[in-house]
Amino acid sequence: MDMRVPAQLLGLLLLWLPGVRFDIQMTQSPSFLSASVGDRVSIICWASEGISSNLAWYLQKPGKSPKLFLYDAKDLHPGVSSRFSGRGSGTDFTLTIISLKPEDFAAYYCKQDFSYP
């Protein structure tokens, strides 16, 4: 049985999905942040177009994979400290960490979950 026809048909259907965009760009600031234990820090994330609250935050420690810790812009993953908080909707989002602890020092990334390539 030749499976190429259904795959081609699926490709055509995907081209006709109305209102679906796959080119949302994300920008974070600052790109580097110097902080000390006990500090309060904020990281801002912007989307090139509205993504509602479809934003997740990940942290990555050296030699480890990124780890989801906040989703839907403000909801903490189970077990994540309430020292972390997120807010925002549309195009502007903020991650805030209060009372920094040594284990908080990592790379932080925002990721939109509104559309996929």
Swiss-Prot record:
Binding partners and assembly: Immunoglobulins are composed of two identical heavy chains and two identical light chains; disulfide-linked.
Region (Complementarity-determining-3): 111-117
Framework-3: region residues: 79-110
GO aspect biological process, one term: adaptive immune response
Function: Probable non-functional open reading frame (ORF) of V region of the variable domain of immunoglobulin light chains. Non-functional ORF generally cannot participate in the synthesis of a productive immunoglobulin chain due to altered V-(D)-J or switch recombination and/or splicing site (at mRNA level) and/or conserved amino acid change (protein level). Immunoglobulins, also known as antibodies, are membrane-bound or secreted glycoproteins produced by B lymphocytes.
Keywords, ordered alphabetically: Adaptive immunity, Cell membrane, Disulfide bond, Immunity, Immunoglobulin, Immunoglobulin domain, Membrane, Secreted, Signal
Domain Ig-like: 23-117
Subcellular location: Secreted; Cell membrane
Stated name of the protein: Probable non-functional immunoglobulin kappa variable 1D-42
Pfam short name (any one): V-set
SUPFAM superfamilies per UniProt: Immunoglobulin
SS bond list: C45-C110
Organism, as annotated: Homo sapiens
Coiled coil: none
InterPro entries in the record: Ig-like_dom, Ig-like_dom_sf, Ig-like_fold, Ig_V-set, IgV_Light_Chain
Major location category of this protein: secreted
Signal peptide positions on this chain: 1-22
Gene: IGKV1D-42
Region of interest called Complementarity-determining-1, as start-end residue ranges on this chain: 46-56
Region (Framework-2): 57-71
Region listing for Complementarity-determining-2, in residue ranges: 72-78
Recorded superkingdom: Eukaryota
Annotated spans, Framework-1: 23-45
Gene Ontology CC entries for this record: extracellular region; immunoglobulin complex; plasma membrane
